[in-house]
A protein has these predicted regions:
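Generic N-terminal amphipathic, Lys/Arg-enriched alpha-helix
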Residues: 1-25
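Membrane-targeting and insertion segments and their boundary/processing signals
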Residues: 3-7, 44, 82-85, 207-210
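Active-site phosphate/pyrophosphate-binding segments
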Residues: 14-21, 28, 36-49, 152, ...
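Residue-level detector of alpha-helical secondary structure
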Residues: 21-24, 28-31, 65-69, 114
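Short, flexible loop segments at the rims of nucleotide/cofactor-binding pockets, characterized by
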Residues: 29-33, 73-77, 100-102, 197-202
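Pocket-edge structural micro-motifs
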Residues: 31-33, 55, 82, 224
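Glycine-rich phosphate-binding loops that contact phosphosugars or nucleotide phosphates
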Residues: 45-191
Length: 224
């Protein structure tokens, strides 16, 4: 048996449950869609002139992907702030998305304070703590998610919440074309490739496992 076909051995090594979170990406996306379907966004948010997403590490990864996928389609500029400070141009016509999986990231909380000072529009993406309390107290739009399908609890493995959730909200605000059709299509594609390239697909029929075997004991270089 190929090692990559030995499920029990892989799970024994995977103490952090990374595999379970990878396999649950479609479930994360489905949960985000279900949670946000009936959510409405303030009309004023759709009229902003620019968007800044404040987040660190995996909490900002969803915005990075959206920027790469939709940069040519969005009618307003999108910038990601991986820092304690927002860009100097942020004002009342800016949408500031505060993205922190934990809800207590100090850089993101610093950006929250700055966004409040300039009366920027604020949207919150978090699973709890300080940002969740602020969202509830101020009745702000956004996504307060319970990551049921991210057992490893790593922000970058919860993209179904941070990335897909932000896609849905941006679609509701009219920044991108993303509604039920696009959401369900994306979920089906994820499920398709999970079946084709997932851990339960045998090495002989699994291109991902075959590539992993070829890369064993090698150092890959990526250019893009």
């Amino acid at each position: 048996m190929f090692f990559l076909d030995n499920i029990s051995q892989i799970k024994n090594l995977d103490k952090g449950q990374m595999l379970a979170s990878i396999e649950a990406l479609a479930d994360q996306c489905h949960e985000a869609w279900k949670d946000l379907t009936g959510v409405s966004v303030l009309r004023a948010y759709s009229k902003v002139k620019n968007i800044v997403v404040a987040g660190m590490g995996g909490s900002a990864l969803g915005a990075d992907i959206i920027d790469a996928l939709y940069s040519g389609e969005m009618e307003v500029s999108l910038e990601i702030a991986n820092d304690y400070h927002l860009p100097a141009y942020v004002n009342k016509d800016t949408l500031v998305v505060l993205s922190s999986y934990s809800g207590s990231t100090e850089e993101t909380l610093s950006c929250l304070a700055e966004a409040k000072k300039v009366d920027a529009k604020i949207l919150v993406m978090t699973a709890g703590k300080d940002l969740a309390k602020f969202k509830k107290d101020k009745k702000l739009p956004g996504y307060l998610f319970a990551p049921h399908f991210n057992p490893c609890n790593s922000p970058r493995m919860g993209l179904g919440y941070s990335f897909f959730g932000l896609l849905i909200l941006f679609g509701k605000m009219g920044f991108i074309k993303f509604g039920e059709f696009e959401a369900q299509k994306a979920i089906k594609v994820i499920e398709k490739y999970n079946r084709a390239l997932g851990v339960y697909k045998k090495m002989t029929e699994n291109r991902a496992k075959q590539l992993a075997e070829k890369m064993q004991n090698k150092i890959p270089f990526y250019f893009s």
